[in-house]
């Protein structure tokens, strides 16, 4: 309801609002449904007041009526309101309407102006000639010419009748042409008849195609705009619609989450007052009207002053005829008066539909779409535009909706990234500092969601930020929350007054809205918003002294005034995404505020290991399946490393190119294996894939090798997939292709008119792809044998029909209007000379089988070079390619799942680590023996190592050598103790002895370097050697040989040579291969060793693995500067 407050609670039911779990999307969806239902009640109330206000609504006080819409409305009144809107029984007089029983063609209803428009004789007028009579029961076919009747019969038999609109028919008596626009209703078929402006049907078709071309040009302009700017997109679409239609003013209305509207873009005649920035209450566009816009996406009112024409219908019909889908439906009197008051005589309204929520999409179809807003044209005089141009505008709106949807998704993703980053920084702040830091430092909790102020109430202390209540007021709010919402986990409202807070008046307009998250029973986080009106400004004309009834008349000014009244003492509502962000932070903070126990860390570390091992096994299974598939596939598959050199080359590529896998490996894909004309597109494809942007349906031209392959070329259509390792780092690119060499040769000949045209098109040769052609008016002029086989429709049934709507739409069904819009754009672009290559195109064949293909559309020229239409070629993906893509998606899904799990573990392990650090700090303050201090230092060193590993989980910096080292002074002996402590449990389990051959002076030797990274590297090498030492009764030895080397300025470098030795065979060969040579690791341990080797190299160290007859060992060499004084004490 426009004037209702929005108060949400988590797991709490109160008189002020509905119980709701904040952060639950399904509840958010239900909440939006409840708002819409409440809005229906408000709309019905306004409608009843208007109906009772007398003739023409002169005594109807609009602003006052909006205020009183909270009053309850009887159910019968709502039913009457909806009936009036949907079954009003009147049409606009610029056309006429006939409703027909579908089975018998018998007329069941007609508008009273139909006789005059069709030059017919009314039943009440006696006539001596054989003029046709219009009455209930007349066969509609007798009113039109024989050829028109045939068209109507064909349309009645269509599955999707609206796709054939408009049908060009002629009145039998007068010969006048009409656009017949047909749609099905519950009792039959409604035929809207709009007078056409030309006598020649061919000109009508050409005019419709010209309208589509104009729309395509506007769509191309939209698609060329830079991304990330919704305002620019809206500004462009109003300019395009105004240019197409010629209306004096065109606006974009956006519906906000609370159902109220705003003008966000406008293009107008210079002398008209601006409406940009105008906000209006939700009741200005009733929910019933919004429902109608989803059903009938284009609505034209030609003259708001025109007297509506009554519809006469068969008395046997149970209720008035449904006019929801009619292009002629008369406007409601309330809306007509509003238009007249604002000086707008004619209007055109175009619905902007985008994808809805996941919950909305469960039912599929239209239910998964959401009305985002409207594009509306106003004109100061009577104006009518023909149906083909309106149809073209609908295509433009579908393209606008697609583009807008992508921009909204991008904006949502950017917002989510911002929220996640802010949450991470806030949590990190909590781990390092005291809780008040999330308010006093930057970023603060104000950066999480849009607000005017925020506060933390922690341990009975108040930490405010921005516009907030006083400390006394916040304590009062806390007492109110505990008293009335004590069993809740949070509350959000746009009006504290409506939520029932008794002290709301004392807060004034500064604090109207509040969101609160309960961290503990005594600790709270608050966000505050001021009243909405301070943010709302309209650039329209101010109240004119002569407009004495300005507040009462229905007019944009009174709408704006009513809106300001509705939002008085109210903030902008808290959006679902904002509440999700607050709820997520609340969950994280709850855990962070609890005392962490050391045992927690053990459980989490154990869980991390278990999850990693399980994930590795699952990924290995997928990887083995991929390898088997690649080796046996009949589709060409190959791969390159990060340098673009071949590292995979399956048998199918060998067969096509004549180049063996051994010869191909190591060659540059771009420079050694591709023709020059493919190099630029391949380089771009490779560049993007190595940065995570995968390409699809790119054509490349491969060279061939061997005596029999001279001067031949292989054409492949490839998908480039980024190859990633376990850490999600990109290590190369895989290409899955389809051989289209045969089709390419045919197409080249075809486009250049080489050879026998008919023989090529209709050849049964399997190399000839499915082909269809269009003339300049998008009518099908060719449909070859392969296309007949693919679609199930014969050439005789298809040729001559319109490709957009009639063929692809009615015969070959497409998935939704968006698919038809995209196909129309491709087709018109080709006719206009802009070719499209490998466009994803899917449809249902005659038997309902779903066909997935790639569409290539090229312009079609005659011998003189003039464009006469378009050629379209269909390529079907091979089963092997489809299977490869399915396995790829499975692998990507598994990798993404592992990434989420790893991110979760990295986040959750921070709290127990913080607990370990806190426990260590407490122990330091007690009286400890020297041995206990040494144990404590070792524990602290291991904790710092684990923290750094978790914090720097991105391995890309290690791979490319850009890792930042954090150097400090430290005891070398402390590092050795920490390293040894990490393998002691494994030594005991395996029964392996550790031998330490380390000079005593090492314990007190101080050096300068990255202590934690050195510790991490040495621990990993030692752990792997212990893991593969013979057991039981085996041994592992650590030998450390330091030597001092003086350098300039009197400084000294400690040259360290450390050996980790074990008897027997030592590490498995694949582990050593992973460590030193492979860019694609096979084992989990191999990845760790490879990273440690690269970290050691970053610290100017080196490692060798040496295998002798009876033993093997790591030899690690590292130079570290020696310091003159010891390091600061640990902790």
UniProtKB/Swiss-Prot annotation:
PTM entry text: Contains one covalently linked phytochromobilin chromophore.
Domain named Histidine kinase: residues: 904-1124
Domain GAF: start-end pairs: 229-408
GO cellular component terms given for this protein: nucleus
SUPFAM superfamilies registered for this protein in UniProt: ATPase domain of HSP90 chaperone/DNA topoisomerase II/histidine kinase, GAF domain-like, Homodimeric domain of signal transducing histidine kinase, PYP-like sensor domain (PAS domain)
Domain PAS: 622-693, 756-808
Keywords from the UniProt entry: Chromophore, Photoreceptor protein, Receptor, Repeat, Sensory transduction, Transcription, Transcription regulation
Gene Ontology biological-process annotations: detection of visible light; red, far-red light phototransduction; regulation of DNA-templated transcription
Top-level taxon of origin: Eukaryota
Record annotation: effect of changing residue 238 to F: In mutant tri3; temporarily insensitive to red light
Region Disordered, residue ranges: 1-26
Database matches in Gene3D superfamilies: 1.10.287.130, 3.30.450.270, 3.30.450.40, Histidine kinase-like ATPase, C-terminal domain, PAS domain
Summary of the function given for this chain in its UniProt record: Regulatory photoreceptor which exists in two forms that are reversibly interconvertible by light: the Pr form that absorbs maximally in the red region of the spectrum and the Pfr form that absorbs maximally in the far-red region. Photoconversion of Pr to Pfr induces an array of morphogenic responses, whereas reconversion of Pfr to Pr cancels the induction of those responses. Pfr controls the expression of a number of nuclear genes including those encoding the small subunit of ribulose-bisphosphate carboxylase, chlorophyll A/B binding protein, protochlorophyllide reductase, rRNA, etc.
Family note: Belongs to the phytochrome family.
Annotated protein name in UniProt: Phytochrome B1
Gene: PHYB1
